[in-house]
Regions:
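Long, contiguous binding/interaction regions
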Residues: 1-365, 369, 376, 454, ...
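Polytopic transmembrane helical bundles with strong interfacial aromatic enrichment
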Residues: 357-366, 372, 480, 487, ...
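Amphipathic alpha-helical interface segments
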Residues: 184-186, 439-512, 516, 528
């Protein structure tokens, strides 16, 4: 899974577009990130910037943004409606994919330390990056705002996590930055078949974590109950990590439950949806659809699609696009307007389409086009890419049998067994599909190295080193194809043994394809290893390939014995 995080810094400038533009330019110039949104506010005198990328790229871009803001914004001249403590007020890191919240918290702490060490801007760490329990709450870190810094920076209990221990001229100019880590927040509105804001609010109070005030007697008009400290006693709602209210939207002519899900691990979108549906039904209403505000991580929709498929007792081992369609239809994401994942899913939005098309040049072809490309006078794609594709087809056949078996009449009780096998097949197939283009890319690296200049001794040395590295890579890729194709056999064996008897021949063909993939890729390992100057590495790779080939031959024989016994 690709490692992606998001950063949403809030800069204390919302009116001077030249300053805002310079900060955004510094973020983009660092490279490797995509700016998704720039939202300046005149009244707040504050701009919220959203950008995403790899952890390393995002951290560097965040640092450059803080640096530029610290150069251009003078907090002594700043006034705005929003609480703030520095030129860069808050700087949260948010995991999107392939990263945990704790990993983001560690990055945030290191970033805060770097900001102070290199820029002399004091930093507090908040939320999951907090180094003191009370500082999990941003309000504690920002208490008194910028104006309180002279006092706070000399107070051992309130001084920044990274700072000099006293007020400085740099702090006077740039203030203090609050660096944190938090989970992704999903903003979502649930459409109701009513115009009543009061009823929408009732549902919101039923489900939101805060709940509703406890009352004496009548739950609507009764006197609010207070505790011994005079604080309102609340009846908690049913969803943790959720804030919600009800409102009426003139544009749509309906009421909605508007919700922020602040902890998507505790309460995923699909669980919140089902609970709002339950609460609405209990009050005689229906949820007619869902409106996602802003963007969501891909996993949010994948998890939702899988959840609704499992509720139907249907196999989840289907294509990612199909799982997303189930999520969209199940929650009515297209109720008010068309829902396009390419515009709403972060991972899709940041994907460079030209780069993706180049990376997937072969697998995006038609079957006919791929065959003609292979048959052309170009040396690539060759046996390595074809081996990977044969392996992918073997996995596809095993997955097909699993999916057919999962909803076979009379086998309803076994749907989960076959769904799990289909999931495994999809995983293996997707990795082998990626290897189709990777194998050709590895060959291209060899050709590029061969084409390097070789006039001087330095050029010869550089060319030799590049050629050795490219040849090693071109040997390791087909070895990866062998290892991955070997994973097809447990799937097709299980399907030959337990799957739909009418599809047993498909499981057999899957085994034949997987064996061909392994043995074909082995030939590529051997021919490329022959070009390695490092003979020890060459012998090691060839020996490993031989073991995998032997295992594949044996596994194929087992599957074919089962298949032939049933034909």
């Amino acid at each position: 899974m690709e490692r992606i995080i998001e950063c949403v810094p809030n800069f204390s400038e919302g009116r001077n577009m030249e300053v805002i533009g310079a900060i955004v330019a510094a973020i983009e110039k660092s490279g490797g990130v995509k700016v998704l949104d720039v939202d300046p506010g005149e009244a707040t005198n504050r701009t919220v910037v959203t950008f995403v990328g790899s952890p390393e790229a995002v951290v560097e871009a965040a640092f450059q943004g803080v640096k530029k803001a610290g150069e251009l914004i003078d907090m002594r001249q700043h006034h705005g409606a929003h609480p703030r403590s520095g030129a860069t007020d808050v700087l949260p890191l948010i995991p999107i994919s392939g990263m945990t919240l704790e990993e983001c918290a560690e990055l945030a702490r290191k970033l805060a330390e770097r900001i102070y060490n290199e820029l002399e801007i004091p930093c507090y760490c908040y939320e999951s990056a907090a180094q003191k329990p009370e500082r999990k709450n941003l309000a504690v870190c920002r208490a008194g705002e910028y104006e309180a810094l002279p006092e706070k920076m000399g107070d051992p209990d309130r001084m920044p996590d990274f700072g000099p221990g006293h007020y400085t001229e740099r702090a006077a100019q740039a203030g203090a930055t609050n660096v944190g880590a938090r989970d992704f927040l999903i903003a979502v509105n649930y459409n109701l078949n009513t115009t009543s804001t009061r009823r929408a609010n009732a549902i919101a109070f039923d489900v939101r974590e805060k709940g509703r005030p406890k009352r004496e007697g009548n739950p609507i008009t009764g006197k609010i109950v207070k505790d011994e400290n005079g604080k309102t006693v609340m009846i908690p709602g049913t969803l943790k990590g959720c804030k919600a209210i009800g409102w009426f939207i003139d544009e749509y002519g309906i009421a909605q439950v508007s919700m922020n899900i602040t902890d998507i691990n505790t309460t995923p979108l699909h669980i919140a949806f089902d609970e709002v549906c339950r609460a609405a039904q209990a009050r005689g209403l229906r949820v007619t659809g869902t409106e996602i505000v802003g963007l969501v991580p891909k996993r949010t929709l994948i998890e939702a699609g899988r959840y609704f498929l499992e509720k139907q007792q249907r196999s989840t081992g289907i294509a990612e696009e199909e799982i997303m369609k189930i999520a969209v239809k199940s929650m009515g994401l297209d109720d008010l307007k068309p829902f396009n994942p390419a515009e709403k899913v972060i991972e899709y939005l940041i994907q460079d389409e030209k780069e993706a098309a180049a990376k997937e040049r072969l697998v995006r072809m038609t079957c006919k086009g791929f065959a003609y490309e292979t048959a052309s006078e170009s040396p690539a794609p060759g046996g390595g890419s074809i081996s990977a594709y044969m392996g992918a087809l073997g996995a596809a056949l095993g997955t097909m049998v699993a999916n057919l078996s999962s909803h076979k009449a009379g086998w309803d009780a076994r749907w989960k067994e076959f769904s799990d096998w289909a999931d495994k097949g999809q995983n293996v197939m997707s990795r082998l599909i990626a290897l189709v283009d990777e194998d050709t890319a590895a060959f291209d690296k060899i050709m590029a190295a061969i084409g390097m200049p070789k006039g001087s001794d330095e050029e010869k040395a550089a060319r030799a080193a590049a050629l050795e590295a490219a040849t090693l890579y071109a040997t390791e890729v087909p070895l990866k194809t062998m290892k991955t194709s070997l994973e097809v056999f447990p799937i097709v064996k299980a399907m030959a043994t337990e799957g739909n008897p009418a599809s047993v021949s498909d499981a057999g063909v899957g085994a034949l394809a997987a064996r061909s993939a392994v043995l074909g890729a082995q030939m590529n390992v051997r021919i490329n290893a022959a070009g390695l100057a490092d003979r020890e590495a060459a012998e090691r790779l060839c020996a490993e390939a031989a073991e995998i080939a032997a295992a594949a031959i044996a596994a194929e024989a087992e599957v074919l014995e089962i298949v032939n016994g049933k034909l």
